[in-house]
């Protein structure tokens, strides 16, 4: 009997560690997806470096209580799967949201973003943001624009002076 309890304590500790380490966690209801669809979803998530696990709701609730995250108890009803991302905050929301568009059985229920509980609406809003790489390229474009414009202005002045001098 005590070995079963110890095993459950280890699982609760594992779940708590995953929630602590993850930058973004998305909870979904996967009821209605067949094996092929689940395999496809797991593959997409794995390629993005996201861990996708199914845990018992009671163990997940205990892990959340252990780390002090409140407000997710109502989410953990029925069959749930949890996507943990330790690197990219946007990736799990984006991948799961895109998958849910083509597979109506998948329902995003909520999540945790950088230690704060997030509603379904907040996860959907996060999914609409560009990826980290996209945001960095936008930032780089914004930073390069003044330099490029300055270089073009200097070139135009130089060309004009060259025309006047010739």
Curated annotation (Swiss-Prot):
Gene: rplJ
Keyword Lipoprotein attached: no
Species: Geobacillus thermodenitrificans (strain NG80-2)
Gene3D superfamilies for this protein: 3.30.70.1730, 6.10.250.290
InterPro entries: Ribosomal_uL10 (IPR001790), Ribosomal_uL10-like_sf (IPR043141), Ribosomal_uL10_bac (IPR022973), Ribosomal_uL10_bac_type (IPR047865), Ribosomal_uL10_CS_bac (IPR002363)
Coiled coil start-end: none
Listed name of the protein: Large ribosomal subunit protein uL10
Keyword RNA-binding appears in the UniProt entry: yes
Entries under SUPFAM superfamilies matching the protein: Ribosomal protein L10-like (SSF160369)
């Amino acid at each position: 009997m005590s070995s079963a309890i110890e095993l459950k304590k280890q699982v609760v500790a594992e779940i708590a560690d995953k929630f602590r380490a993850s930058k973004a966690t998305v909870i979904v209801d996967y009821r209605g997806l067949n094996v092929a669809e689940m395999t496809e979803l797991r593959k997409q998530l794995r390629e993005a470096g996201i861990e996708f696990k199914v845990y018992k709701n009671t163990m997940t609730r205990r892990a959340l209580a252990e780390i002090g995250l409140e407000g997710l108890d109502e989410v953990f009803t029925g069959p749930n799967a949890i996507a943990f991302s330790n690197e990219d905050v946007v990736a799990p929301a984006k991948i799961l949201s895109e998958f849910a568009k083509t597979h109506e059985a998948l329902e995003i229920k909520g999540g945790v973003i950088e230690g704060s509980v997030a509603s379904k609406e907040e996860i959907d809003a996060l999914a609409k943001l560009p990826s980290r790489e996209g945001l960095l390229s936008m930032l780089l474009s914004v930073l390069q624009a003044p330099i490029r414009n300055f270089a073009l202005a200097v070139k135009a002045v130089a060309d004009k002076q060259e025309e006047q001098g010739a």
